[in-house]
């Protein structure tokens, strides 16, 4: 089952449509009241390399795709971004460039990510992502944390991604909290 309390589920690109469908179903159950929000565990979805998952891309609004049946993975993913956080389903995504951000999600969906980390990029891309050209002046081993809700922009030194052992340890600690 995908929604174990603080369980960890790793998925491949081939499994993403199924996972997004299950998350979408869970979100709809929470929205309708079938799953009480008070007792429902928070779900955190980490997507490393969102730009690589083409099935999650927002479809053209004017395309002539079938209007009947289940929502496409891209449409369901967009709904998760725009409606999920209020229902306890949170997304953390890494994308390699601003062009790929535009390919991967709608402008409305991008505004739902109120905390963003950016590395050095062009002034135009920086202004589009964090409303400031400051990321164009970043040096080596520097990043900016933009918190839209607090209206802050903080420079920091990022570190390498944690190894698999760290993720296992973090999952164990989260499971103990329950």
Q: Predicted regions: what is each one?
A:
Residues 1-128, 178:
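P-loop NTPase catalytic phosphate-binding loop
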Residues 24-27, 133-134, 160, 174-175:
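Generic secondary-structure transition motif, activating predominantly at the C-termini of alpha-helices
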Residues 48-51, 81, 130-134, 145-146, ...:
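Generic hydrophobic/packing signal
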Residues 56, 60-66, 74-75, 115-117, ...:
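Conserved P-loop NTPase motor module
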Residues 122-127, 131-150:
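Phosphate/diphosphate-binding loops
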């Amino acid at each position: 089952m995908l929604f174990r309390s603080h369980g960890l589920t790793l998925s491949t690109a081939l499994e993403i449509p199924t996972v997004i469908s299950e998350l979408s179903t869970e979100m709809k159950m929470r929205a309708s009241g079938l799953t009480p929000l008070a007792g429902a565990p928070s779900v955190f979805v980490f997507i490393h390399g969102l730009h690589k998952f083409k099935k999650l891309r927002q479809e053209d609004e004017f395309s002539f795709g079938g209007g009947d049946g289940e929502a496409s993975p891209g449409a369901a993913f967009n709904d998760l971004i725009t409606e999920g956080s209020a229902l306890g389903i949170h997304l953390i995504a890494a994308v390699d460039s601003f062009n790929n951000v535009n390919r991967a999600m709608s402008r409305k969906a991008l505004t739902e990510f109120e905390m963003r980390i950016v590395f050095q990029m062009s002034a135009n891309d920086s202004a589009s992502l964090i409303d400031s050209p400051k990321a164009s002046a970043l040096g080596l081993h520097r990043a900016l944390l933009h918190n839209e809700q607090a209206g802050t922009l903080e420079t920091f030194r990022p570190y390498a991604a944690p190894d698999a052992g760290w993720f296992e340890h973090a999952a164990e600690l989260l499971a103990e909290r329950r």
